[in-house]
């Protein structure tokens, strides 16, 4: 049985003053019947981790390099994330795939680096609007899963997040039936490779999750939580999503 996880991705948002939102999450985190994770920009991981240490809150990174160290100006290694206090890292997010040309094989190498640094890798998969319209969503997701998850990764070391690219930050969400179809497919694909152990891998939905639609999304089969973007920036919004997942 997979653990429920509410994960917030701050993306390129936030300065130290915004950590007041973390303090404001304290009550929601204390009452949560799920794991709660925030992934801020790299500059905020260490100060956020200090606050998180006072509550049952995990902190993560948003990407990592495949190398442990070296001449890679501007990059951050998985070991650096861990040293700053991170326990998780988001990998293969559609914005990284699009903006930085990261391919599934690159993501797999990043996952290996993350695991070597004792980080849990949140591996993102999902289709573009054109791929959805062409009815190749499941093929795309299968290909990304096969290419992005290294063979040696164990269920305890990974989380999979389904994020339809066309729903991220747009206010649009797939129908509940569409979410169920993809999440059931992901579970089936993982089971084909990992057997019954695949049931221990949390499957998150990401794409315009808000307090108002969270409960119905969390009622969908094989949805174990959410990867939340904009709504994770405000404690009032993210707290509502945490409460909805706790009640699911």
Curated annotation (Swiss-Prot):
The keyword S-adenosyl-L-methionine does not apply. It is an enzyme of class 5 (isomerase). Keywords: Cytoplasm, Gluconeogenesis, Glycolysis, Isomerase. PROSITE patterns: TIM_1, TIM_2. CDD domains: TIM. It is found in: Cytoplasm. GO terms for biological process: gluconeogenesis; glyceraldehyde-3-phosphate biosynthetic process; glycerol catabolic process; glycolytic process. Belongs to the triosephosphate isomerase family. This is Triosephosphate isomerase. Pathway: Carbohydrate biosynthesis; gluconeogenesis; Carbohydrate degradation; glycolysis; D-glyceraldehyde 3-phosphate from glycerone phosphate: step 1/1. PANTHER family: TRIOSEPHOSPHATE ISOMERASE (PTHR21139:SF42). Substrate binds at residues 9-11, 169, 208, 229-230. Transmembrane segments: none annotated. It comes from Jannaschia sp. (strain CCS1). Pfam families: TIM (PF00121). Its EC number is 5.3.1.1. The keyword Cytoplasm applies. One of its GO terms (cellular component) is cytosol.
């Amino acid at each position: 049985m997979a653990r429920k996880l509410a994960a917030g991705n701050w993306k390129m948002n936030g300065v130290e003053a915004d950590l007041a939102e973390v303090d404001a999450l304290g009550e929601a985190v204390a009452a949560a019947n799920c794991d709660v994770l925030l992934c801020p920009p790299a500059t905020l991981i260490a100060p956020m981790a200090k606050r998180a240490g006072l509550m049952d809150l995990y902190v993560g990174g948003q990407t990592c390099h495949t190398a442990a160290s070296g001449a890679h100006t501007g990059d951050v290694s998985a070991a650096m994330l861990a040293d700053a206090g991170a326990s998780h890292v988001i990998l293969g997010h559609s914005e990284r795939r699009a903006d930085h040309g990261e391919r599934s094989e690159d993501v797999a190498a990043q996952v290996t680096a993350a695991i070597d640094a004792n980080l849990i890798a949140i591996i993102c998969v999902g289709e573009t609007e054109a791929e959805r319209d062409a009815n190749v969503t499941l093929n795309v997701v299968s290909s990304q899963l096969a290419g992005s998850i290294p063979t040696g990764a164990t269920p305890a070391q990974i989380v999979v997040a389904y994020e339809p690219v066309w729903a991220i930050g747009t206010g649009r969400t797939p129908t509940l039936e569409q979410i169920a179809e993809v999440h059931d497919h992901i579970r089936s694909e993982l089971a084909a490779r990992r057997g019954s152990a695949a049931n221990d891998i949390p499957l998150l939905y990401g794409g315009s999750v808000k307090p108002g639609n969270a409960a119905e999304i969390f009622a969908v089969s094989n949805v174990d939580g959410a990867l939340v973007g904009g709504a994770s920036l405000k404690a009032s919004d993210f707290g509502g999503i945490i409460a909805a997942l706790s009640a699911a």
